[in-house]
Each structure stands twice: as C-alpha cells, then as structure tokens.
Amino acid sequence: MEDSESSTQAPAAHHGISLASSPVRALIRMRRKIRTLKKSRLQLDLTTGRPLDSAKASLRRQISTDRASLFKTTTYEKQQYFNFDTPTLEKLALNNQIRKKNRKKSRHVLYPGNVRKCLPVEQKSKAKRCLLLFIAIVCFQIFNAIENLDDNLQKYDLDGLEKTLQREVFGQRRAIDKLMDHLKDYLATHYHNKPLVLSFNGPSGVGKSHTGRLLAKHFRSVMDNDFVLQYYTMHNCPDENDVAKCQAEVSGMISEMISRAEIEEKIPVFIFDELEVMPVALLDVLHGYFQLNQSNEYLNAVYILISNIGGNEITKFVLQNSSKDFVNVPQELRHLVLTSLRKQHFLWDVAEIVPFTLLEKRHILDCFLDELLREGLYPDHSNIESLAGQLRYYTKENKEYSITGCKQVVAKVNLLQPYT
C-alpha cells in the first residue's frame, strides 16, 4: 500500500518539476551542488587540518564562479515578445543614431515637387510703429519747448540788456552776472510758482540806482511803459503822514499793471528805490505781493528792491579781504547783508541778494571817461587823473577804494564845462 502511494507521488512530483522552466531546474541543481561542495569541503578540512576561514573563502569563490557560469549559460530560452536581456553598448549607440536621424527628418516639412510652397506671411508688430510715433511726438514737444524758451528770451532781449549793463556799469561784474542769471532763468517762461524778488544792496555810489535806471529803460523799450514801474520813496512818498495814501497808490498800480500784463502774457517789472527810508506800512504792502498764496497772475512779476542797507557790512568785508582775489562773492557776505536786512523788515527773507561792492580807483577813472564822452568833452587823460584825485579813497593792500563811488563824478564834470 505504501509502495503504491510512493509510486503515485513520484510521478506527480516528476510531472510538476517538468512543468517548471529551465531556469528553475538550473537553480535546483546549483543548490544541490553547493550542498555537496560544503559537505566535501568540511570533510576535507577535518582530515587535512586547514583553518575554517580559508575554507569558507574558497567556498565563496567557488559559488561566485558557479553563479557567473550560470548566467553565461544559454539555458534561458529566448521569448518571442519580451525579454530581460541587457542591451550591449553597440546596440545602444545604434539606437541613438537611429533616433537622431528620425528627429532630424521630422523637423523638415516635405512638399510635393509639383506644388508651390506657400510660406506663412510674417506679420509686422504694430507696437514698434507706436513706439516710434511716441518718440517722435516727445522729440517734437521738447524742440517746441526749447523754441518757446528762446522766443521768450528774444522777446525781452536779455542779450542786449547784458551788453548794456557790462558797458555802462563799472566794477560790478559779479553783480551783473548774478542779476542776468536770475533774469534769464525767470523770463524764459511765462508761468511761475512765485515772483522774482531781487535786492540790490551796497554802499552809496557803487551803481545800484544806475543799474535800476538801465533796467527800467530797457524793459520800457522791449515791452511798454505800462509794464514798468519806477518808484522812488523820497519822490513818490516824501511825507510820512501820507503813508495810507501811498499804500493805496502802490497797491492800485501793482494790481492794475499785473492785470494788463496777464492779458498780453507779459511779465511786469517793478523797481523800488530808496527802501532804507520807506515806511514800514508800505513795506508791508510790498510783502503781501511776495506771498505764494495768491492768484497765478500775481506770481508772474519781477520786483527789484534797491537800498543802502548792508552797505557798511559790505565795506568792512571788502576792506578786510582786499588781498584775496575771490572769483565769486562768498556766502559769508550775503549772510552779513541778509542779517542787516532782516533787522529792517522780514520781506527780504524771500529776496535774492545781489551785493554791489566798493569801486576801485581804476573804475572811477572809467566813470569820468564815460561822463566826459556823454557831455561831448575831450577825454584828456591827465585831466581825468586830476579829477579822480580830488575824491577820497580807502587805502588797503596797495589798493584804493572810492568812499563815495561814482556819485560825485557828474558834479565834477559839470564844473569843467564853463572853462572849456
């Protein structure tokens, strides 16, 4: 009975093994072989007496060689649809070349030989045209603005004014340059955010009032008499009891002139002389027109304030610094003048200070020469020297500065006329 069962089981087992694939059978054989090798190695080590470590190492080498030979065998059957064979380097290189060729071919569009190629029409970007148009408009506006600035300067003929001042005002080159810089910047356009307030300060006889008269004459010639006001305190408001009347007159003249100038798009010029004797109430009226919280037409005006205030400070500064040939009037001088002006009234806080310094003797000679030519007299050099020697001078560092400036030149020349 038992023999029959074993006989029946043996064919069944044999049939199951036959169903397994060839790799399974190879693994079974390799496992059996490993077991027999282990047993034989152990028996050999026991008989020969070699150490177990060397036996184990040799056994590992044998197993690795058996595994390598197992994978190298051709017992694996090549499947029809899929396998796990690792590709060689040659196959990989060949496949990459084929793929590259396919990609290169796919990029080109093939057209039939008898068909005309119709390439897509390239559409031009409109943004580029808009950008060019915008740049052209901006350039035109800039060019137009520059032309308008030139037109304004030509309208007031500031170049001619500068030449006149340089020709007829002696010894005040720095003051004239500063004055013209302010006028050119302000009169270049008609719209401003504040009025231009200039203050001529210096000792007597240095050319402040003479410069004011030249400015009034020039602007009357280029604009009209209706847009230029010359106001002398000693002449227009000599009596302190008439201050209220003077206030009304000054306020009315300024308002009326500004209104007319705004209609014709012109900038009026107001010249106030002898401010050192002007009443405080009248200074308050002027200060009201210098404020920023006014209508726009009152912001387009030029105010020139002429006074001897700060003249002593300028005289001391020039005499103390006579050895220095400074190109520009230092800020220290303007600070000294402004300190003296603030003691008089606070309206000078918004003014641009233009200091007029002392005149040297050579400038006095120029004044005599110019006056002689005006009167039609022969300009004898020795006669001019004698006339200039009659004036008083400050002497400092081999330089002579006139105490009274050119103020007595006209009177001295008039004394010559009966004898010529």
UniProtKB/Swiss-Prot annotation:
Chief place of localization: membrane
Binding annotation for ATP: 202-209
Pfam families: TOR1A_C, Torsin
Keyword ATP-binding: yes
GO cellular component, one term: membrane
Annotated SUPFAM superfamilies: P-loop containing nucleoside triphosphate hydrolases
Entry's transmembrane regions: 130-150
Keywords from the named record: ATP-binding, Membrane, Nucleotide-binding, Transmembrane, Transmembrane helix
Cellular localization per UniProt: Membrane
One MF term in the entry's GO annotations: ATP hydrolysis activity
Membrane-topology annotation of the record: Single-pass membrane protein
Family to which the UniProt record says this protein belongs: Belongs to the ClpA/ClpB family. Torsin subfamily.
The protein's name in its UniProt record: Torsin-4A
Organism: Xenopus tropicalis (Western clawed frog)
